[in-house]
């Protein structure tokens, strides 16, 4: 009965109002305005319509099929077409040497110059290329004929970068991959580049924990990448003397990066997908445990890096807020090497002095890792420079050309 009432109402009470528009832009504007209470058009929807109407004949059918495949692959890689266009904007800005700190809106950026950037023949191909990268980062997939995707050290560095507090790490990684993925020595150079990027970003955030601290540096790096596969990291100099203290008592947003960096030094596998930051000395303690120390000092010390471990969520729930001797059994069962070693150690008591000693060990270890990465990157930079002809060599080449010898 209800269905007949609906049909009657639709035929006799609904009003069909035709709306015509002189251009597609006008039609899209009208649709967005009338549809504000429904599901609004995304930038990707508008870009799809623009590209489709720019094509002719069978190219339209091919485009629709490729767009559908792009959407499916992006979703499977935990990304979206909307996000891919945003990432790609930074690649195009790098090609255009645009290092302005103000990030334009995606729709505004692509709509400039009559949507010319959308009509570039390589657009869809490069969006598919980006998805390949995210398949590795987000899903842990191994790509056919791309050996770097099974390189555990590269995957560990990428995993550590995913814990960076904002998305600025993504843009140079994407640009580097698009530009050089087919090069002969890509795997080695990509590994060193990623380590160098992580070293710069982590160091900067430890000392200046704000989003804008690296924005300008990253934009300059993006432009440098499209010119060279050994780009110069023109990051501002930092006070290295403050780094040790910053590692020992880090901002909460950088703790996961530090723990991953430390953990990956000691194992050749990724951390489990679900792990938590474990406080060795519990956040809730008995007030009579430290009679001579103020609660504020204890609370501050508990948050030091020396009191923290990466720990599987299930084991962490079992360990609870128990004291060290009681939690060692769960630590020993961990598949995270540095946590397991702590559980198998002969240490029976954990106190503020223990935290201070481990603070020093961890900061020394992290600083050593950062120095190693910087040195490895500088080595390939020097190799490139040493392989270039000197002024004397160039003069000889010019002389030989003039004489017709070459």
Residue ranges of model-derived segments:
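Flexible coil/loop and intrinsically disordered segments
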Residues: 1-406
């Amino acid at each position: 009965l209800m269905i007949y009432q609906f049909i009657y109402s639709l035929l006799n009470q609904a009003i069909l109002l035709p709306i015509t528009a002189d251009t597609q832009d006008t039609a899209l504007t009208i649709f967005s305005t009338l549809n504000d209470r429904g599901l609004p058009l995304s930038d990707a929807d508008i870009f799809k319509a623009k590209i489709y109407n720019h094509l002719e004949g069978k190219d339209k059918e091919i485009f629709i099929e490729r767009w559908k495949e792009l959407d499916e692959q992006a979703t499977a890689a935990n990304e979206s077409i909307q996000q891919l266009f945003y990432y790609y904007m930074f690649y195009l800005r790098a090609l255009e040497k645009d290092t302005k700190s103000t990030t334009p809106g995606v729709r505004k950026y692509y709509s400039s110059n009559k949507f010319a950037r959308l009509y570039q023949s390589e657009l869809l191909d490069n969006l598919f290329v980006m998805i390949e990268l995210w398949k590795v980062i987000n899903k842990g997939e191994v790509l056919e004929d791309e050996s770097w995707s099974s390189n555990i050290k590269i995957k560990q560095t990428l995993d550590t970068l995913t814990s960076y507090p904002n998305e600025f790490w993504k843009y140079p990684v994407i640009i580097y991959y698009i530009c050089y993925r087919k090069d002969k020595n890509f795997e080695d150079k990509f590994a060193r580049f990623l380590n160098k990027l992580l070293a710069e970003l982590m160091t900067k955030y430890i000392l200046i924990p704000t989003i804008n601290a690296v924005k300008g540096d990253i934009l300059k790096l993006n432009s440098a990448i499209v010119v060279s596969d050994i780009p110069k990291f023109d990051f501002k100099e930092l006070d290295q003397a403050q780094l040790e203290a910053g590692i020992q008592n880090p901002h909460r947003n950088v703790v996961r990066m530090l723990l991953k960096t430390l953990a990956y030094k000691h194992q050749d596998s990724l951390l489990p997908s679900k792990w938590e930051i474990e406080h060795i000395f519990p956040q809730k303690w008995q007030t009579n445990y430290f009679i001579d120390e103020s609660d504020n000092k204890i609370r501050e010390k508990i948050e030091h890096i020396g009191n923290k471990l990466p720990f599987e969520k299930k084991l962490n729930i079992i360990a609870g807020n128990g004291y060290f001797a009681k939690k060692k059994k769960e630590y020993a069962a961990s598949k995270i090497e540095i946590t397991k070693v702590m559980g198998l150690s002969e240490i029976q008591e954990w106190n503020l002095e223990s935290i201070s000693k481990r603070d020093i060990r961890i900061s020394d270890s992290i600083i050593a890792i950062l120095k190693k990465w910087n040195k490895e990157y500088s080595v390939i930079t020097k190799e490139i420079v040493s392989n270039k002809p000197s002024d004397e060599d160039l003069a000889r080449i010019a002389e030989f050309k003039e004489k017709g010898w070459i």
